[in-house]
UniProtKB/Swiss-Prot annotation:
Domain of life of the organism encoding this protein: Eukaryota
Protein name (database record): Ferric reductase transmembrane component 1
Enzyme Commission no: 1.16.1.9
Residues carrying covalently attached carbohydrate according to the record: N4, N111, N268, N360, N501
A biological process term (GO) from this entry: cellular response to iron ion starvation
Record bears the keyword Ribosomal protein: no
FAD-binding FR-type domain segment(s): 255-410
Subcellular location: Cell membrane
Organism per entry: Schizosaccharomyces pombe (strain 972 / ATCC 24843) (Fission yeast)
Length: 564
């Protein structure tokens, strides 16, 4: 069914949303070129610290924009009334004008009757739902153009979904009110009953999407979210014949995205070594994804969706890749929490050695597990560290979908980098450091602050950090804080070191973010700088507060935050 003239306002609304995003992409690339030019100039002439008045005004405006983007609640409070104000013109409806009760070919400028407005609200909600559906897919072209992850498009997806639900709810209650006033039979009509089902799906979607529910019961959120999405497709399709064309677009987008993801997953089925390092930490290592037509470029800081059939065929979970694109393998640091990760830890733990001393040095034993896809390899190594890893390594069949995220490392275009991580958040920051060092970059100085309570995790990353600082002329300062009950001095393998251009220090206690960031700002001056952080919500909120407190209005600082 083709879209006719009465759908034009909905189509205009969709085009307006996409047009705004395209304009944003254009501004993003202009900003990227500005950063590259300025960073190149600083690399060739470090003494030049001039900042013209036009740049100061631009950076002041960008600082306001950055504050809003990094504080989503405030941005949403501003966006909601603006969106509804813009939506008012789109709920008018052009209808044939009447002359003495007879329709003529003349078209009236608009019909603002209750029935017409209620109908327009329904079509507008339908159009917003289509746009929201587009921003929910993993293979999102806008994310690639913004050198970002599809997860950053989730903000657009969530806000559009909320607007669609609110406008759709107003549409539904408006028709219920109109039916109650004059046409009570409409309250039990087929179209209204389907509307009741849509309303029920809205309630389930809203409750399951609340941050508390999503974080605490992610697996339930995942199932309910997908079931409700499919339910919306079916019920809106059946609700009104004029909605069918919009739902066909959603189905096409869904089939394309799911088809690409399923194909990649089956092409990238492989065996991973899985080790339970500590009760709350899992280390995974496996071959890098195969290159194919449906494969995506791999950039530093990307993440991967994995499925372990021996645990569940229906659950996929995202994990950040701790290795760099130049490696022929991928590494994952997995924090053990409830649900999938806890079951994986239990599975691996049940297959590890019960008594390491019973292993024969000359023998290698492979124990087959009853579940398909899991082998346990037990072998003796010379060092205690290797013994723990090798003897406990379980071979697990994994389906990989990805990588997803930026196709290149945007941080290497900035002169100064401030990187901050908490716990397994290092899996996002470490590849950025290694990639910036290994590839040609415009960066001259890196400050990396990491807080972790796991000495085992510090040990795993220690070798990579040592390699990073030894083979570059770049100025690098790395501060690793052990926040456990015992001091870092008791971990003999963690030794601080320094040279002319680098410093790697292991310290006790929580880091003082304010001091580190103020020192970084002092070193940065007027040059291009970028901040990247990955950690818990509490850690990120503390860092944002620190940045807002100490950053001058004209600081040339790009900010990016990843929550784990």
């Amino acid at each position: 069914m083709a879209i006719n003239s009465s759908d034009k306002w909905t189509v205009i609304a969709i085009c307006l949303i996409l047009g705004i995003l395209l304009a944003f992409i254009l501004m993003f690339w202009l900003e990227r070129f500005r950063v590259i030019i300025k960073s190149n100039a600083h690399k060739h002439d470090p003494s030049d610290k001039r900042q013209i008045w036009l740049e100061k005004y631009y950076l002041f405006v960008r600082q306001i924009y950055t504050y809003l983007v990094t504080h989503k609640v405030i941005l949403t409070l501003i966006a909601v009334p603006v969106v509804f104000a813009i939506s008012i013109p789109f709920i008018g409806m052009q209808t044939p004008a009447s002359s003495h009760g007879k329709q003529t070919t003349q078209v009236s400028t608009g019909n603002w009757s209750k029935n017409a407005v209620a109908a327009r609200l329904g079509f507008l909600a339908c159009g917003l739902y289509v746009t929201s559906y587009f921003f929910s897919i993993k293979n999102n072209p806008f994310a690639l153009l913004l050198i970002s992850s599809h997860e950053k498009m989730n903000y657009v997806h969530r806000r559009l979904s909320q607007y669609a639900i609110m406008i759709g709810a107003i549409h539904g209650f408006a028709y219920i009110g109109l039916a109650a006033q004059g046409k009570r039979a409409l309250l039990t009509a087929r179209v209204t009953i389907i509307g009741y089902v849509i309303l029920g799906l809205m309630v389930i979607m809203i409750v399951s999407s609340l941050p508390f529910f999503r974080r605490r019961f992610y697996e339930w959120f995942f199932v309910l979210h997908h079931m409700c999405s499919i339910g919306f497709l079916i019920t809106i399709w059946l609700h009104h014949r004029r909605c069918v064309v919009y739902m066909k677009v959603c189905v096409a987008v869904y089939v394309f995205d799911r088809g690409c993801r399923m194909l990649r997953s089956f092409l990238n089925r492989s065996k991973f070594d899985v080790v339970l390092v500590e009760d709350d930490l899992i280390y995974m290592k496996g071959p890098r994804p195969k290159k194919s037509f449906f494969g995506l470029p791999w950039g530093a800081g990307n993440h991967m969706y994995i499925n372990i059939p021996s645990l569940s065929y229906w659950q996929i979970h995202p994990f950040t890749i701790a290795s760099v694109p130049s490696d022929d393998f991928i590494e994952l640091f997995v924090a053990v929490r409830a649900g999938f990760t806890k079951r994986l830890a239990k599975k691996v733990s049940s297959k590890s050695l019960s008594d390491v001393s019973d292993i024969n040095i000359s023998d290698e034993k492979i124990e087959k597990n009853g579940d398909v896809g899991i082998e346990v390899m037990e072998r003796h190594s010379l060092s205690q560290e290797d013994l723990v890893f090798e003897s406990s390594a379980a071979k697990v069949s994994v389906l990989m979908d990805g990588p997803y995220g930026p196709v290149s490392n945007p941080y290497k275009d900035y002169s100064y980098l401030f990187l901050f991580a908490g716990g397994v958040g290092v899996s996002y920051i470490l590849p950025i450091i290694l990639d910036t060092i290994k590839k040609q970059s415009r960066t001259v100085h890196i400050t990396f602050v990491w807080s972790a309570r796991s000495s085992a995790l510090l040990n795993i990353v220690h070798k990579s950090l040592c390699e990073a600082v030894r083979y570059t002329e770049m100025n690098i300062n790395i501060f690793c804080h052990l926040t456990n009950s015992y001091p870092v001095e008791e971990v003999s393998s963690l030794n601080s070191q320094s040279a002319r251009n680098y410093s790697l220090q292991y310290l006790n206690g929580r880091p003082d973010v304010n001091d580190y960031f103020k020192d970084f700002l002092h070193a940065t001056g007027t040059q291009t700088a970028a901040l990247a952080s990955c950690g818990s919500d509490k850690l990120l909120r503390h860092l944002k507060s620190c940045v807002n407190t100490h950053s001058p209005s004209t600081v040339d600082l790009y900010q990016h935050y990843e929550e784990i």
